């Protein structure tokens, strides 16, 4: 479902991406009000936010996801779908870098090779277009930052997301109000069908994220880890086959190097998993 969001936002390409993000935040906040009310989590949410340092981390997480959403939607409506795919492919490598530089984790040989391949791939892709692939890097860094910050926030997935969109709601309403007077704004120019699409932005945001959070708590990591490549793979195919974005030799080489790096990480994750160890001769039975 997450991978289909590219098609969703592409249908709204005529509107300013900053206005679209403001509506996304507003609609997500409306959905989360309903979710928190139905699940009776207001007291848990407010008590969780009173804990030391939580509000500051929620604000930082909200800003990180705001950057991610904004760059992603801007790129989709301006014809840079392939670069969004690259960004989400790079994100696992960016996560490894954060683990080493911030958390102090050590790099295995396979991950060293993967990181080097990722860096070379970004350089090749940058040279192929004559500029730094800032869309891909911004998406990767913002998504990695968001994931890192979420690990430090002692709130459930539902409470955390609610707190984030509630924090972003006031700026979003200001943006909507400031831009609604323009002739090409959502208020001034949207058709009935486009209004319906925009009104669904909250569900399009909340449902995939909730499903992912649910799976993350119940599905083994060896099964869950490869699924993070599904969304960028869908975006890659959409950008190439549906939206006919250029895929020259340099881009093919760059993407191929990223895929090899991710294959190394995935293979290592599977081989090091307890389930795999139990299947090996001499492994501890479950």
List each model region and its residues.
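Glycine-/small-residue-enriched transmembrane alpha-helix faces in small-molecule transporters
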Residues: 1-22, 120-152, 174, 238, ...
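Hydrophobic alpha-helical transmembrane segments of multi-pass membrane transport proteins
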Residues: 1-4, 8, 59-76, 138-149, ...
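Structural motif at transmembrane-helix junctions in multi-pass transporters
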Residues: 14-20, 70-87, 210-227, 246
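Membrane-interface interhelical linkers
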Residues: 30-60, 109, 161, 166-198, ...
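Hydrophobic transmembrane alpha-helices of multi-pass small-molecule transport proteins
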Residues: 32, 110-128, 139-141, 250-269
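C-terminal transmembrane-helix exit sites in multi-pass transporters
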Residues: 74, 91-110, 233-252
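Helix-helix packing/entry segments at the starts of transmembrane helices
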Residues: 86-90, 157-167, 206-241
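C-terminal-most transmembrane helix of multi-pass membrane proteins
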Residues: 229-286
């Amino acid at each position: 479902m997450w991978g289909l969001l590219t098609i969703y936002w592409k249908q709204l390409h005529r509107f300013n991406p900053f206005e679209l993000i403001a509506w996304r935040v507003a609609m997500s906040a409306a959905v989360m009000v309903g979710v928190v009310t139905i699940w009776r989590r207001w007291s848990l949410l407010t008590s969780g936010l009173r804990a030391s340092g939580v509000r500051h981390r929620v604000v930082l997480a909200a800003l990180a996801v705001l950057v991610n959403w904004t760059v992603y939607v801007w790129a989709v409506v301006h014809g840079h779908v392939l670069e969004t795919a690259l960004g989400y492919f790079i994100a696992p490598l960016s996560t490894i870098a954060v683990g080493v530089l911030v958390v102090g984790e050590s790099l295995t040989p396979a991950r060293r090779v993967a990181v080097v391949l990722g860096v070379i791939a970004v350089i090749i892709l940058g040279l192929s277009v004559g500029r730094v692939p800032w869309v891909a890097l911004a998406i990767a860094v913002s998504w990695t930052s968001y994931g890192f910050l979420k690990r430090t926030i002692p709130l459930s997935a539902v409470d955390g997301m609610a707190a984030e969109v509630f924090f972003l709601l006031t700026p979003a309403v200001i943006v909507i109000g400031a831009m609604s007077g323009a002739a090409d704004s959502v208020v001034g120019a949207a058709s009935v069908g486009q209004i319906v699409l925009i009104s669904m932005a909250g569900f399009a945001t909340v449902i995939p994220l909730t499903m992912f959070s649910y799976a993350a708590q119940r599905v083994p990591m060896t099964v869950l880890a490869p699924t993070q490549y599904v969304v960028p793979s869908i975006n890659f195919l959409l950008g190439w086959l549906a939206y006919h974005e250029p895929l020259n030799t340099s881009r093919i080489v760059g993407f191929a190097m990223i895929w090899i790096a991710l294959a190394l990480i995935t293979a290592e994750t599977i081989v090091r998993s307890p389930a795999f160890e139990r299947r090996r001769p001499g492994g501890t039975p479950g």
